[in-house]
Regions:
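Extracytoplasmic metal-acquisition and chelation regions
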Residues: 1-177
Length: 177
């Protein structure tokens, strides 16, 4: 057993619109300033948080931390190598060593899925996608904005649906902590 209360500050998350609590806070702020009701947004974001909170312990990695706000505080354990994650947060190209460490994580067989933002790819990302495909690691694509014609809340729920399906299909693995 290990601690899943990853010490991440949601104020520092780059893609804050993927933090259900932040979305609810913004909706309430808009309600106070402009009227209307935040209840539908709050209800839907609470449901997303609850659904993600009920998922089994699995390991994931992200080519960039697009889904961090959805996943932190859940049993979904982000095993992205720290050096790689740091480079993406700093908007720098990952080193050869960081890419190699990430590929090793994929090839070890304990990764349940890989999160990719198809709007932000490069040769390193493609190598990771290729490694995931070669090792039968499911890939979840999450974009920064909903597809054309899709409501934001619907999109967050669709992403949650996809994560639930992939986690449910994950085969038990030896997740050495």
């Amino acid at each position: 057993d290990h601690d899943h209360d990853h010490d991440h500050d949601h104020d520092e998350i780059e893609h804050a619109w993927f933090v259900p609590e932040k979305v609810s806070e913004v909706a309430k702020e808009i309600e106070q300033r402009a009227g209307g009701s935040a209840s539908e947004v709050t209800k839907r974001m609470d449901a997303v948080s609850e659904r993600l909170g009920q998922l089994d312990h699995v390991h994931l990695a992200m080519t960039e931390p697009i889904a961090a706000g959805l996943l932190y505080g859940t049993e979904l354990d982000d095993v992205t190598p720290e050096q790689y994650a740091r480079s993406t947060l700093n908007h720098t190209d990952p080193s050869i060593d960081a890419i190699a460490a990430f590929i090793e994580v994929i090839e070890q067989g304990s990764l349940d899925f890989l999160v990719v933002n198809p709007q932000s790819t490069n040769s390193a990302t493609q190598r990771l996608i290729d490694a995931a495909n070669d090792n039968n690691v499911p890939i979840i694509e999450i974009t920064e904005t909903p597809p054309a014609g899709t409501n934001f809340l619907d999109y967050i729920e669709e992403v949650t649906d996809t994560i639930e399906r992939v986690v449910a299909a994950a085969e038990p693995k030896d997740h050495a902590a």
